[in-house]
Amino acid sequence: METIIHELDEIDLQILRIVQDNSRLTTKELAQKIHLSVTPTYERQRRLERMGYIKGYVAVLDANKMERGFMVFCNVSMKQINKQIANSFCETVAAWNEVTECYNISGDGDYLLKVCVSSMQKYQQFILEKLGEFPYISQVRSFFVMDTLKLTYGFPI
């Protein structure tokens, strides 16, 4: 069942704004920011997790320091597509560490992959040994990221 934002009150929205910006806060620190005691704050945050508003907590790593700073968006077109082929492609892509994001898209192409590797040579290896080996792909168009102009991990609430 899909939830809607109308079931949240202003305190819930405050919690979402704050943890989206800094998920490392302790419950006590979060409680101070929203002017509630610790127990109700803890219960609200856990409820937001159970309801699916908070999907998880992550550390954002520096891609360059992790030798994953060579970023490419791949527009993948399939020769044919059906449920079996789509499921197989999704399962295969999920196993590739180089792919950090994968979207089923409309328009020109069927999938958009975000690939993060250390170099052009590693990208070529990925294309030849992984993506290029998947049957039913008719075309891969690569878009190399020269600079990141905007990168956010949240959105306005």
Each language-model region and where it sits:
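A compositional/biophysical signature of low hydrophobicity enriched in polar/charged and small residues
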Residues: M1-I157
